[in-house]
């Protein structure tokens, strides 16, 4: 089988390995540092973000959060982590899947183990969404070309 006529919709394992990982630091959590290979954009996906993420020991995947509009999922490929979902914590590992329909409980991953965690992450890219960060009492409003955040304690009744 020749790959000279391979469609632009196909990424081989070698193609994926050649995508340089980009370091992503969460805007509200400096310990949430992900090494991300973005797959969806490479094959032209516009409404779904698809990424392979590496989370080093001691790191968090994101600030504990939930979305009003975007659904997302995680599928663990390698390693272990603690999944914090709502008020509970669970150990997760290779082969485990988490899906967050809207509305969902707030969630994050914490790599408390001594090896990297690798997972497939995908989610919607709705043009409008509100992301809530309950532990830091903050929300972010996302609209076309704009992202704004506000502290819950700074809100006043009208």
Model-derived segments and spans:
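A short, N-terminal "cap"/entry segment at the start of jelly-roll beta-barrel domains
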Residues: 1-47, 131-158
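Ligand-binding loop in jelly-roll beta-barrel domains
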Residues: 44, 102-129
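Conserved short histidine dyad/triad with adjacent acidic residue
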Residues: 33-38, 51-67
